[in-house]
Amino acid sequence: MRLGLYFSIGKMIPDHARHRLLNSSSVASLRKSNQKVRPQLFLANIGQLITLRYSSLKPGPRRGSGLKELGIIENGAVLCLGGKIVSVGTTKDALRDPWLKKNRKKVTEIDCAGKVVLPGFVDSHTHPVFVSPRLMDFEKRIEGASYEEIAAAGGGIRSSVEGVRTAGKRVLVEKVLTVLGDMAAHGTTTVEAKSGYGLTVESEMKSLEAIRDAASRWPGTVIATLLGAHVVPKEFQGRSPKYVELVCKEMIPLAAKRRLAQFVDVFCDKGAFTAVEAEQIFEAATQHRLSVRAHVGQLSETALGPFLRFNPASLDHMDHVREDDIAELARHDTVATLVPGANYFLGLKEYPPARKLIDAGVPVALATDYNPGTSPTLSMPMAMSLACTHMKMSPAEGIAAATINGAWALRLADRKGSVEPGKDADLAVFDVSDHREIPYWFGTNRCVLTVMNGELWGDFSS
């Protein structure tokens, strides 16, 4: 679908912002002084500008055929001021604009030379707070051990706990910051980051503080999630109700009081928490005004009805889902967040039923599920490639699921996930000539520039 939006820059710029325009030398000097810089950016000569502008007037996440509406502008242009997108259209219209003619030398201009520009990816499911990779699990899986067998032998999630419990917060902050930087290099600008490898009140709060501190040093956007209910720690084995009580009465209230999390997550599956326990945790989260989300259906079917009454932002994994639950989910705005990287790395033959969900009208998002055990990938393009090849999503559906629907899964769609005036200036520039190449060139990184809240990330000297 092609669009030609009228590029009326002058009308979009508030008067108080006009005197803050920076030229290139100003940007360079401010960078040297370590001040936060949001240069006024003009991206021009974009081969395909993927706006994700939507023709439907009905609010809510993309579903069905709406996932294929990319709102492509050929030879596009974008102007960003003060960390926001203010105008979108064709380069031809932009260069005619009187305001840009007058101020062009004061704006940091990026010639995209026919490359593809799209909204920064929204990775709505990650586990970045850990210390070491799970190499033993990797080898055991190669030898034929299942997820459940590895967990029963002391591997899996519990094997990451000791490292987080003993690590200093500074170590965790630097770890998370490195992850965020690597994600940005692949075009990701918004990240949901979970705790979940501490499993004590102290270690879960330390993990959330590490996320907060790392986020303060990264120009992108980070949404923190308390995942105290990841698994039952070994000291509570056989006493799951007591651990759930700890999560509900201590972890959740403290995370809410300290404003360390926006969401509470729970892993509801065999070997983790029951649906009844998940409901108890959701009740506690709701009482403390925290939104909820859940890992569900990764290993076995779980009835979704009890979860939906809490209006979860997303239900994630969804490998095993019943027909009646699909029909029910299609009547809600809860997003089904699919993480094919986990299925790939676990060597599974089956993948989440994306086609069935999409065709039924369920809103679907894609995420990396970045974690040390089952999906150690930072790359949203790789997640998209797996979605196309193993879940039969089209490239257009993959892009929408990785951007605007990811934003809906984090309840950030008013700010993130599309290239439209008024939204945050989050952009990814890919050195390809067609958007379909992004999932096509799997295992490579074609992202050459990322813009996060108006700040440049990458080698933009050329």
Residue ranges and their predicted role:
Residues G155-V176, G181, T189-G305:
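Metal-coordinating catalytic core of metallo-dependent amide/deamination hydrolases
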Residues S291, E301-S418, F430-R436, F442-T444, ...:
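Active-site-adjacent C-terminal substructures of enzyme catalytic domains
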